[in-house]
Amino acid sequence: MNVKLPKITRRRSPEVLAPAGNLRVLKTAVDYGADAVYCGGAEFGMRAASKNFTLEDIEQGVRYAHAHNVRVYATVNIIPGNAEVAGMNAYLGALAEIGVDALIVTDIGILMAARQIAPHTELHISTQAGVMNYQAAAALYELGAKRVVLAREMSLPEIREMRAKIPGDLEIEAFVHGSMCMAFSGRCLISKYTTGRDANHGDCAQSCRWKYHVVEEKRPGEFFPVEVTDSGTYLFNSQDLNMLAHLDEVIAAGVTSLKIEGRAKGEYYVAALTNAYKTAVTTYLNGSENATDLARDDTFALPEWVLQEPYKVTHREYSTGFFYPEKTVGESITRGGYISDWLWLGTAVDYDTVTQRLTVLSRNKMVPGQQVEFLMPGTEPIPFQIPSAGIRDETGEMVNEINHPAHEFSFPCAQVIPPGAMLRGKAR
C-alpha cells in the first residue's frame, strides 16, 4: 500500500455528504459538488447490496477526492460478532494507513479499538447507534467521537436542544434525503426472519416494502382496518425523506453535515441529488452575510428547477420524516412503490467544436424529436431536442434512432457540452 494520504482541512460551512457504492459513483459525487463522500469496503459496512470498495478502490477514491478538496469517510458500522473482531481491527489499520478522513462506527468496541489503531483519524458515530439525546452524544464525545450521525427519528426542536447542550466541537450529521427504515434506526429483524439476510450486517432485503395483507389475531380472516387496496397494503413501507426545501431550518438547528442516503444507488441518482443539495446550500450561504450565521430571518427560496430534481430520480413518495413533531407517523407511510418518471439516457463522452457534434454513451433508447435535458454540475439543466437527422453510430453509419445501450452515438449539437454531462428524459 502507498504512503498515507494527507487529510483535507474541514470547512466551516454546512457540508453536503454524498453516498458512493463504488469508485465510479464516488468520482461522480465529487464532480457534482459533494464536500464529502462516504463509502464502505467489501466487509464491515452496512450496505452489502452496493458494489463496495476494495482497499485499492478506497485508496484511489481518497486520492481523487483529496485532489478536489473533498473528504472521504469510511463506514465500518456493522454490529460485529466475536469472529469478526480480529479482521475488523486489521481493516481499521488499513483504512488509517490509506488516509481516510473519518471512520463511521456503531459498535462501542470498534470505537475504542479505532482510538488505539487510528489515533489521527476522526471517529463518527453511525446512525445505527441510535443517538437520540444530548447526554448520549456528550458521552460518545468523551469516548473520542468527533461527530454523531443522528437517529432519523429526531425532530428539529430536539436537534436544536442537543446542539445547545453538547460540546461546541462535537459535530452533528443528519440524513436529509433518501430511504427511511420502518424500524428504529435500522434495527430490524424482518429481513432476517423472511429471507435469512441480516440487516445488521448490511444485507437487508427490504422485506418491509413487500405487499402485505395484515390480519389481527382476534379477527381471523379479516383484513386489519388500514388503507388497503386490492393489491395489498404498504403498512410497513416508509416514504422517502426529502428536506431540500427546508435546508435552512436544518442548518439553523445546528446540523454540520447534510447526508444523502443511497450507497446502493447509481451515478445518475447521486449526481442529480448532490448537485441539487449543493446548489441549495450555496443559495443559503449566498443569502447570508455571514456563512456561520444560523439565525437568519430572511426567506429561503430555491429555484424551481432545484426543487424538481428529487422528482427526476427514482423515488418513493416524499415526506419530511420526523423533522416536524406535529406530523403523524402515518403521514410518513407510502401507499405505493417506486416512482420513475425520468430516465438516465446517456452520458456525454466528447464534443467536437469544429463539427459541433456531441458523442454520447447511451443507456436507454433515444429517438428523433425527443425532449431531453443535460445535467451538469453547478448549473440549471439545459433542455435539448434529439435532432431529426444526422445521428451516427460508433462506426460512422447514419441511424434513425439511438437504441443500443452501452454504445456510442453522435449527433449535431450547437451547445458545447462537457464530457460527463448526463442526458435524461421523461419515461416514455
What are these regions (language model features)?
Residues 86, 123-132:
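Gly/Gly-Pro- and Ser/Thr-rich, intrinsically disordered tail segments characteristic of DNA damage-repair
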Residues 50-55, 86-92:
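Glycine-rich loop at the start of a catalytic domain that most often binds anionic cofactors/ligands
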Residues 118:
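Conserved phosphotransfer cores of two-component systems
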Residues 1-32, 36-39, 43, 61, ...:
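Surface-exposed amphipathic alpha-helical tracts and adjacent flexible/coil segments at the periphery
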Residues 47-66:
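Glycine-rich, positively charged N-terminal anion/phosphate-binding segment
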Residues 109-110:
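Alpha-helix capping/helix-boundary segments
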